[in-house]
A protein has these predicted regions:
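Small beta-barrel nucleic-acid-binding modules, primarily SNase/OB-fold domains
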Residues: 2-9, 14-269
Length: 269
């Protein structure tokens, strides 16, 4: 069932940590191209999806808000509603226009009275701590901006970052095994890097059969090379990776694009 739009917060402020957090001063990113769809909010599903009055269902590209049953699900939905309620909304597309559920997969903007963009909603949600950044190979526009804002929100303990449900995980295989089939952020030191039959394996322990591993397919190596990341020279590097945790000789995250890996100590060199 669709959640009714909350009325308890104004669209210009979000209740956060017992006080009000002003929305001014965000890192605004102008649309990559023309705004293509417009409308006003009808109802909110959760912190990363809603439906317009026209009936068009919208999924905010590049962020992952708490799901139903998780901590901060209702708070994230309220935050999204507060940002866009009563505002004219414009959608810009930076990758596929529809997801597998036929929702518009869009960068979402609130608009000024003259129709020009006012706020980039993804940026606001991440900055307030109500969305984790999630990039895909075909939707990685302005990811660095969002990742920087996520780091600030996480360090400040805003929103969902107060909950252990969304902690950055260490690469300990036993606890990570509890999060199989879920989106996680993992940070740790790469112990070794190896190529086997064209696959690249970044190992976070001494036993590849049980330890956490990041895997990159042969067909995706070129993307990392073009981004200046030498996968063969990763031993001893501290990295932060994000993606879906699976089991394959221990917990594994498969990466198919370089935007899903960060270097907390600085850019790769």
């Amino acid at each position: 069932m669709l959640a009714q739009v909350p009325n308890i917060l104004s669209r210009r402020t979000i209740l956060l940590g017992g006080g009000y957090f002003c929305l001014a001063g965000n890192a605004f990113a102008a649309p990559a191209g023309d705004l293509e769809d417009f409308g006003k909010l009808a109802r909110v599903f959760d912190g990363d999806s809603f439906v317009l009055g026209s009936g068009l269902k919208v999924r905010l590209a590049n962020i992952f808000a708490p799901e139903k049953g998780q901590d901060y699900h209702r708070a994230a939905a309220s935050a999204l509603a507060a940002l866009i309620e009563g505002r004219k909304i414009g959608l810009s597309y930076t990758g596929p226009k529809r997801d597998r559920y036929d929702r518009a997969l869009a960068q979402v903007y609130t608009l000024k009275p003259d129709g020009t963009p006012d706020q980039w909603v993804q940026s606001e949600m991440v900055r307030l701590g109500y969305g984790r950044v999630r990039s895909y190979v075909d939707t990685a526009w302005k990811i660095k901006t969002l990742l920087d804002e996520e780091t600030v929100a996480r360090d400040a303990g805003r929103g969902l970052w107060q909950s252990p449900d969304f902690s950055v995980r260490p690469p300990d295989p036993n606890p990570l095994a509890q999060f199989v089939d879920s989106f996680q952020i993992v940070e740790g030191l790469i112990i070794s890097a190896a190529q086997v039959r064209g696959m690249t394996f970044l190992n976070f322990g001494s036993d590849y059969k049980t330890d956490f591993t990041v895997s990159i397919a042969r067909r995706d190596r070129r993307k990392f090379e073009k981004a200046g990341i030498n996968l063969e020279d990763m031993e001893g590097r501290r990295v932060r990776v994000r993606g879906w945790v699976e089991l394959y000789n221990g917990p594994v995250i498969w990466l198919d694009h370089p935007e899903a890996i960060e270097f907390p100590g600085g850019d790769f060199s």
